[in-house]
Amino acid sequence: MAKNIFLALACALTLPLIGCVTTNNTQIANTEPFVIDSETYQATGKSERIKSIVLHYTVSDNARSIKTLTTGNVSAHYLILDNNDNKIYNLVPESERAWHAGNGGFAGRTILNDTSIGIEIVNAGIKPEYRDALKNGALDYHPYEHYVEFDELQIKKVAQLVQDLAKRYSISAKNIIGHADMAPSRKIDPGAKFPWQRLYKEYGIGAWYNEFDKQFFMNQDAFAAATIPEIKQAFRDYGYQINDTDVWDKASRNVVYAFQLHFRPQQPTGELDLETYAILKALNKKYAGRDDFY
């Protein structure tokens, strides 16, 4: 009796602060409906979650690409087939994470699945007769002619989609990349025949260097004087992940090859030559925000 009187008194004393009920001698706070107010106060410290667009090819035909991307552990936000319809297929809502990027990074960001939109384009990648070309060791990398062309309608679909995404999410030009750019140790897509330069010139999509700047940096003496660590730092300045060894080992050459696939696709060799160096310097002058070029 005394215990119940004490509990009732405790509830009465605390009632101004919380509602009080008793169930089996247990004190419980009443729950009330609360309103989420998202208008009265607004924070300025915020940005879009989507920071980049990653372009892929599927290395498969339409049917297999659809099956792989809708039933397996790999997915993408968008799929562009190689047929003649007028559709771009949205497989994963943009608000959700698709499993398309995997391990790698670009522009200081890793786990790009969390911060990117993935676009898969149906394309075989390497022509069937060249798929085993690297196995005998005669070649380290596939040259331009080994890659499969993209369909014209596919490129127009890519252009429309990427323009829209880049505008809606305020994605910077240099963060519109290929899978190879963020994972050069294991990926080469969308390959040498993806028309990065055309997309830049005709649709204003992605990054490209100024020819005048490239010619300025085509200086053999400056190239010869540049150390390997300095050149690797230039790759990092643009956004590529590359090791800090003082040799052009296979991992480093993979980065060079990925860079060439994007910015010098007609001659992707994996070798750091004068033209590749000049293009890298020109890109950094234009996009990396550095002011020590002249």
Walk through the language-model features, giving the residues of each:
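Bacterial N-terminal signal peptides that target proteins for export
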Residues: 1-9
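C-terminal motif of bacterial Sec signal peptides marking the signal peptidase cleavage site
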Residues: 16-19
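Bacterial signal peptide processing site
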Residues: 21-23
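Active-site-adjacent loop/helix surface patches within enzyme catalytic domains
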Residues: 25-174
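Second-shell loop/turn segments in exported
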Residues: 41, 66, 105-106, 141-153, ...
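Acidic, His- and aromatic-enriched active-site or binding-groove loops in soluble protein domains
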Residues: 45, 79-80, 192-219
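Acidic/histidine-rich, metal-coordinating catalytic segments
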Residues: 171-186
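Short acidic, glycine/serine/threonine-rich helix-capping segments at coil-helix boundaries
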Residues: 221-283, 290-293
